[in-house]
A protein has these predicted regions:
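Hydrophobic alpha-helical segments embedded in the membrane of multi-pass proteins
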Residues: 66-76, 92-96, 121-125, 182-186, ...
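Transmembrane helix-bundle core of multi-pass membrane transporters
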Residues: 133-134, 138-195, 223-224, 243-249, ...
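Membrane-helix/interface signature in polytopic inner-membrane proteins
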Residues: 187-227
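Alpha-helical transmembrane segments within multi-pass membrane transporters and channels
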Residues: 108-147, 183, 283-284
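Transmembrane alpha-helical segments in multi-pass inner-membrane proteins
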Residues: 233, 247-307
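Single transmembrane alpha-helix segments in multi-pass membrane proteins
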Residues: 41-50, 55-106, 131, 263-275, ...
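Inter-helical junctions in multi-pass inner-membrane proteins, predominant
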Residues: 52-62, 153, 192, 226, ...
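Membrane-interfacial amphipathic/re-entrant helices at transmembrane-helix boundaries
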Residues: 2-72, 110, 216, 224
Length: 330
């Protein structure tokens, strides 16, 4: 009799555990789609508050045209964040890379693009070596290089802005820039989805020690990703030059903040890991662009916009942070 009762109790206990697991699994599945629903809510909200003005072809074009550089740079940042790391030097890196591109554009376009990419890659390499070899947290390293590079950018543009060659701004047409952006997105998606790189990034983000024990070359992977992300930002500098035509001391200012907000709007867990998805990039950047444009159209001042974006950022970090692990930013 006792054994039967124990069996029944065990069945009830296992059933309760299974029920809780099913609930957690359902909540996890719902959370996957929250960023997409969030984008639709943001779009719907501003469609109502602006009387549909935000959905006019002109404003849609303006939203998209302002997002090419951000979308491209976000690809590299996504890879870094998937490892549980951060890069606060993106804006300053873009400014320096853009200055390099503008200077060499006076001689040859292809050479200028390559020079900008190399400049970004070298900065990424410096960040990676200090972070990995010096065993210093990534956000500390990149905050230092952010200020350093901002100073370099200011020195370069002290007397006057660095202008790109006149033909560069003639490349500013929507089909070309959209095609380039889609190409970068596809290459990044395919590389991280169908090669070992994507698995390694998530493994490092989830548990760096376990990844090392599993045979993943953590240090080499981190260095490679920071270099690649730097190269991507260097290429984004070319897009920035096409849009603006010159570089000033404020080039790329606050880009790192925009990228971070975009990532969390897309559902990116701030500590990376297995829950990072490439859709974080596309949904996040589009959500940020619509949110920013909508706030401008509603007539909010810059200060109020920053306040709202800050509140949204805190809410998204709280929602998508993985509290089930003890991982911190590396």
């Amino acid at each position: 009799m006792d054994s039967k009762e124990m069996t029944l109790d065990q069945k009830e206990g296992s059933g309760e555990i299974r029920s809780r697991f099913d609930v957690l699994e359902t909540l996890s599945s719902i959370r996957k789609f929250l960023p997409f629903f969030g984008f639709l809510i943001i779009l719907g909200f501003f469609a109502i508050t602006t009387g549909g003005a935000i959905l006019t072809p002109k404003n849609i074009t303006l939203i998209l045209s302002g997002g090419y550089m951000l979308m491209i740079a976000a690809c590299g940042v996504w890879m870094i964040m998937t490892m549980g790391c951060l890069d606060f030097s993106q804006g300053s890196m873009l400014g320096v890379s853009c200055a390099v591109f503008c200077f060499f554009s006076q001689y040859n376009l292809i050479f200028a693009i390559v020079a900008g990419i190399i400049a970004g890659g070298l900065i990424g390499l410096i960040n990676a070596l200090i972070h990995v070899k010096g065993q210093i947290q990534s956000f500390v390293v990149t905050m230092c290089t952010m200020f350093l590079l901002r100073g370099v950018c200011a020195l370069i543009t002290t007397e006057s802005p660095v202008y790109a060659a006149s033909y560069v701004t003639k490349l500013n047409n929507m089909p070309l820039l959209m095609g380039i952006t889609i190409a970068v997105l596809l290459v990044t998606f395919i590389t991280t989805r169908f090669t070992a790189l994507g698995h390694n990034l998530k493994a490092i983000g989830a548990n760096e020690k376990a990844a090392r024990f599993a045979g993943i070359k953590v240090q080499k992977t981190k260095i490679a990703v920071y270099v690649v992300a730097g190269c991507i930002t260097g290429f984004a500098a070319f897009i920035n030059a096409v849009k603006v035509g010159s570089v000033t001391s404020t080039a790329g200012n606050m880009l790192e903040t925009q990228l971070l907000i975009a990532m969390v709007l897309g559902g990116m867990p701030i500590n990376g890991g297995a829950r990072a998805r490439f859709s974080n990039v596309v949904v996040g950047v589009l959500s940020y662009l619509v949110l920013q444009k909508g706030l401008v159209m509603m007539g909010f001042t810059t200060e109020v916009q920053q306040l709202i974006l800050g509140l949204v950022f805190i809410a998204m970090v709280a929602l998508f942070s993985d509290r089930g692990t003890n991982q911190v930013i590396k």
